């Protein structure tokens, strides 16, 4: 069933399109929510989502899928986040349309290339495959989700540093009074400005944990157990941790090659 759709496990142009957050040939989207001018009124898209949920509960899966598509075409659909668009592939799976569901996941992966969306999509791919009992193949997306979460927090750290330096420049230019003298300092920018953003330390902590052997082991242990490969968890965690620590940019085919050293996922 997945023979045509799993070309992403081989080095090919299709794999690149599915696996990496590079500039796609379609309009780039993100999961950022746009504000609505009629915030006081009930969102038509969200109303349709609720109707889809009720149809799903009634096990009317085909009708639920169509209702989701209506929601995505609604005039206020730009308010929807990627997690709400990830419902369609899972509903298609429930309707027995597994190939169509996997295709929908890959299309979302091409359209929503921001690191926040990419992490969610990779994790949903893992869930989708596990529901298909494709446990070995799910391992790759379990690890790919970690990679995208690392990229997300690296971006968060960089944003915190940039914001700190920008505020310092504004204070110097307009002679603003310092308002953070009594705030706790969590680090310093390369320019020497004190970082008082409390989230900065959280992002650094998450990065350290995600890249560590223990952190990787903890994240993949359950998935390895489902694949009946629990004994390979430690050596795989060792290699993945080393990869995360040594590289600044991650590629799906490189992750796949590391996994192939321990597990045959084809």
Give residue spans per PLM region.
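Alpha-helical segment of the N-proximal tetratricopeptide repeat
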Residues: 38-73
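Alpha-helical junction/boundary sensor with strong preference for TPR arrays
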Residues: 68, 74-76, 105, 111-116, ...
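Generic helix N-cap/helix-start motif at coil->alpha-helix transitions
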Residues: 40-50, 78-86, 115-122
């Amino acid at each position: 069933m997945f023979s045509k759709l799993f070309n992403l496990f081989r080095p090919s142009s299709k794999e690149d399109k599915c696996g990496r957050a590079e500039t796609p040939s379609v309009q780039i989207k993100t999961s950022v929510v746009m504000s609505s001018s009629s915030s006081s009124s009930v969102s038509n898209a969200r109303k349709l989502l609720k109707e889809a949920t009720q149809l799903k509960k009634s096990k009317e899966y085909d009708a639920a899928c169509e209702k989701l598509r209506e929601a995505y075409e609604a005039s206020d659909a730009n308010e929807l986040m990627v997690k709400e668009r990830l419902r369609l592939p899972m509903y298609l799976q429930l309707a027995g349309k597994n190939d169509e569901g996997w295709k929908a996941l890959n299309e979302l992966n091409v359209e929503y290339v921001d690191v926040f969306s990419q992490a969610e999509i990779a994790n949903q791919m893992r869930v989708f495959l596990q529901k298909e009992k494709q446990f070995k193949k799910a391992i790759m997306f379990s690890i790919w989700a970690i990679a995208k979460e690392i990229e997300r927090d690296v971006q968060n750290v960089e944003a915190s540093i940039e914001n700190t330096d920008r505020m310092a420049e504004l204070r110097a230019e307009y002679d603003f009074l310092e308002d953070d003298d009594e705030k706790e300092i969590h680090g310093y920018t390369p320019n020497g400005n004190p970082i008082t953003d409390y989230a900065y330390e959280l992002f650094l902590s998450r990065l350290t944990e995600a890249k560590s052997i223990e952190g990787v082991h903890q994240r993949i242990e359950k998935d390895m157990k489902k694949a009946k490969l629990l004994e390979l968890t430690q050596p795989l965690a060792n290699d993945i941790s080393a990869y995360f620590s040594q590289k600044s940019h991650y590629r799906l085919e490189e992750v796949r090659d590391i996994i192939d050293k321990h597990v045959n996922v084809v």
